């Protein structure tokens, strides 16, 4: 039997209001709230403000990460949500971001990560990894 270790949502959000994505000050609370809405566990986050506009950010999660990059001049947000926890948590975080940013269109991909791992090769004794 094969197992997957996580789910990775990769999305391009088009037609987003530039006022929502021009500054890290505007978009960082949206991403922080998405983490909460997704029941994800934030370890740390970092946001960067580009000049004259645009922002990037990444949140390190206990489950993996959430990252984004914005191009306000195009109304574009590129987004990654990767979690090795409950798969529905990534969906909840994504749905929240869509609800708040209201893109006019979305290019969305969802991948099962590590899906070629065979269950019978799992190391269950931590001493075997030392």
Swiss-Prot record:
GO terms for biological process: spermidine biosynthetic process. The modification Pyruvic acid (Ser) is found at residue 64. It is an enzyme of class 4 (lyase). InterPro entries: AdoMetDC_fam_prok, S-AdoMet_deCO2ase_core, S-AdoMet_deCOase_pro-enz. The record marks 63-64 as: Cleavage (non-hydrolytic). It catalyses: S-adenosyl-L-methionine + H(+) = S-adenosyl 3-(methylsulfanyl)propylamine + CO2. GO terms for molecular function: adenosylmethionine decarboxylase activity. The active site is at 64 (schiff-base intermediate with substrate), 69 (proton acceptor), 84 (proton donor). Its EC number is 4.1.1.50. It comes from the Archaea. Its cofactor is pyruvate. Pfam families: AdoMet_dc. Binds 1 pyruvoyl group covalently per subunit. Pathway: Amine and polyamine biosynthesis; S-adenosylmethioninamine biosynthesis; S-adenosylmethioninamine from S-adenosyl-L-methionine: step 1/1. Heterotetramer of two alpha and two beta chains arranged as a dimer of alpha/beta heterodimers. Belongs to the prokaryotic AdoMetDC family. Type 1 subfamily. This is S-adenosylmethionine decarboxylase proenzyme.
């Amino acid at each position: 039997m094969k197992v997957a270790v996580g789910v990775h949502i990769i999305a391009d959000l088009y037609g987003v209001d530039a006022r929502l994505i021009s500054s890290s000050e505007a978009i960082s609370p949206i991403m922080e709230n998405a983490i909460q809405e997704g029941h994800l566990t934030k370890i740390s986050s970092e946001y960067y403000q580009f000049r004259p506009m645009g922002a990037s950010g990444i949140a390190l999660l206990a489950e993996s990460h959430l990252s984004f990059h914005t191009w306000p001049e195009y109304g574009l947000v590129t987004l990654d949500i990767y979690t090795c926890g409950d798969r529905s948590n990534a969906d909840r975080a994504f749905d929240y971001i869509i609800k708040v940013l209201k893109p006019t269109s979305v290019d969305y991909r969802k991948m099962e990560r590590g899906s070629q791992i065979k269950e019978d090769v799992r190391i269950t004794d931590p001493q075997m990894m030392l």
